[in-house]
């Protein structure tokens, strides 16, 4: 199993230094509440996360949350919703028949989401969390805030934002 990081931009563009904004652009996090998924061992990812740690939160996403994310917010090129039929048609030669199989292939490392951008959009546009954030959006997660690394607790936040 490959560890997948779900990276979520929490803070907006105002007063963001140019180097941080450039790194967020490289991560495809152009706007607030956008989420991307990358393999944890992606070269250079740790350094990029260290640079933008005061604007994003990230952690390991699990399979049930990944499936819910694709069903609720997954889009294909042209803004088409991702359905089991669409996945079965596009990934027929890989033997993937539904969204659960697609999520499993991502978690096993057979497919890499950011390299499938002509088939599946790599950015998920989420709502603000229902019930609001638990802490300050300007403090690190370990100091009762929302920013930085949060491990498995990213799944709870994503489910509140679907």
From Swiss-Prot:
Membrane-crossing segments per the record: none
InterPro entries: Ribo_uL30_ferredoxin-like_sf, Ribosomal_uL30, Ribosomal_uL30_arc, Ribosomal_uL30_euk_arc, Ribosomal_uL30_ferredoxin-like
This protein's UniProt keywords: Ribonucleoprotein, Ribosomal protein
Pfam families in the record: Ribosomal_L30
HAMAP family per record: Ribosomal_uL30_A
GO cellular component: cytosolic large ribosomal subunit
GO biological process entries: maturation of LSU-rRNA from tricistronic rRNA transcript (SSU-rRNA, 5.8S rRNA, LSU-rRNA); translation
UniProt GO molecular function: RNA binding; structural constituent of ribosome
PANTHER family according to UniProt: 60S RIBOSOMAL PROTEIN L7 (PTHR11524), LARGE RIBOSOMAL SUBUNIT PROTEIN UL30 (PTHR11524:SF16)
Complex formation: Part of the 50S ribosomal subunit.
Protein family according to the UniProt entry: Belongs to the universal ribosomal protein uL30 family.
Protein name: Large ribosomal subunit protein uL30
Keyword Cytoplasm annotated: no
